[in-house]
């Protein structure tokens, strides 16, 4: 899986309602209320809102071939990309106003139609006909459709925050919920933080290697700066190449410490801020383990579980680099 996938997919604040769900009507009213009461917040901070719910063991039918398949049905109001982990193989995702289209995973498409290129085929879900608009690759058999009922209720919300709210996405999401009174019993998961943390963990090793090479280049320059130009030029050239690599890598991958924005306090005099953030993250991780399982949270938990092993390996490799550099310094040619 592409490392940038984690950063791109976990790019919202997830709300998991613990009660009977949040109605579609109340969501529409909350959005309109937000536009009227605080238009600047809505236009400058809240980028999008997606509501969704899942149904295990939903049955799909090919009415012409009589084939049936059991899937995880996802009913939503908003952007399909913000629901469960998947990659589009053919066709398109269904936009919010299209209540007659659907999206299938490739295995279910083959099971129902005998081919994974099933776009424009018809199927039945709860005796209602739907046209396949897109086929995706997913870890589970899945069927996605936009909600057509005004009385629909959802247990999951995904709030996307604009760049103006970077580092404070969780705070803005909580403020939106408090102002709209959609629910007062929920779990909140800061996907921005976890997505950037997972993304950075894959790149951190390369960043550390480049940093060590840069330190090595500067040290060689200091050693040879009082010697002949013939000895000095290779050190300058090496340092220039390493700096160019760092700048190029930064341009292609972005800030490797973007997840750390969460730990920057709004007021520098707030010395308890860091403790509050750490406690909040601990609570979120504990809540994650007890939430009703869905592919989104399962991927996050699995990724966070492998993260600690990846960080342990990173520490060992970094320690090895340190020992190598230490022994190198002891060599006679390193003495200025």
Regions found by a protein language model. Name each.
Residues 45-96:
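The feature marks short, hydrophobic/small-residue-biased sequence motifs that occur predominantly
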Residues 20-26, 67, 98-100, 139-145, ...:
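Solvent-exposed, non-transmembrane alpha-helical starts
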Residues 73, 100-101, 122:
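A residue-level structural signature of the nucleotidyltransferase/glycosyltransferase Rossmann-like core
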Residues 1-59, 264-288:
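Membrane-proximal extracellular/periplasmic loop immediately following the first transmembrane helix
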Residues 78-89, 104-163, 173-180, 189-190:
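Mid-to-C-terminal secondary-structure elements
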Residues 313-321:
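Hydrophobic alpha-helical transmembrane segments of polytopic membrane proteins
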Residues 162-164, 169-213, 253-310:
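A cross-kingdom feature of multi-pass membrane systems that activates on extracytoplasmic/periplasmic
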Residues 208-254, 321-336:
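Juxtamembrane interface at the cytosolic side of transmembrane helices
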């Amino acid at each position: 899986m592409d490392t940038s996938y984690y950063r791109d997919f976990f790019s919202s604040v997830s709300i998991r309602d613990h009660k009977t769900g949040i109605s579609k009507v109340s969501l529409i009213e909350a959005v309109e209320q937000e536009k009227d009461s605080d238009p600047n917040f809505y236009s400058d901070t809240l980028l999008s809102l997606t509501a969704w719910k899942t149904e295990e063991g939903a049955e799909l039918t090919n009415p012409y071939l009589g084939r049936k398949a059991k899937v995880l049905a996802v009913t939503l109001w908003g952007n399909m990309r913000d629901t469960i982990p998947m990659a589009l193989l053919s066709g398109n995702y269904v936009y919010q106003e299209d209540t007659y289209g659907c999206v299938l995973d490739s295995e279910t498409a083959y099971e129902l139609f005998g081919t994974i290129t099933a776009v424009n085929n018809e199927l039945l879900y709860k005796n209602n006909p739907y046209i396949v608009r897109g086929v995706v690759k997913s870890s589970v058999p899945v069927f996605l459709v936009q909600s057509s009922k005004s009385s629909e209720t959802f247990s999951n919300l995904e709030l996307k925050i604009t760049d103006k709210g970077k580092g404070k996405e969780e705070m803005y999401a909580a403020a939106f919920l408090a102002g709209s009174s959609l629910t007062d019993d929920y779990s909140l998961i800061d996907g921005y933080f976890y997505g950037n943390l997972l993304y950075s963990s894959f790149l951190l090793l390369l960043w550390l290697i480049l940093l060590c090479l840069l330190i090595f280049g500067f040290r060689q320059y200091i050693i040879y700066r009082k010697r002949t130009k013939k000895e000095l030029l290779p050190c300058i050239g090496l340092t220039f190449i390493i700096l160019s690599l760092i700048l190029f890598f930064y341009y292609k991958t972005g800030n490797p410490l973007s997840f750390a924005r969460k730990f920057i306090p709004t007021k520098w005099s707030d010395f308890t801020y860091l403790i509050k953030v750490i406690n909040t993250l601990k609570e979120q991780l504990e809540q994650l383990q007890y939430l009703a399982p869905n592919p989104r949270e399962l991927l996050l938990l699995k990724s966070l579980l492998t993260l600690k092993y990846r960080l342990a390996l990173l520490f060992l490799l970094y320690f090895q680099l340190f020992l190598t550099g230490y022994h190198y310094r002891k060599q006679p040619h390193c003495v200025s």
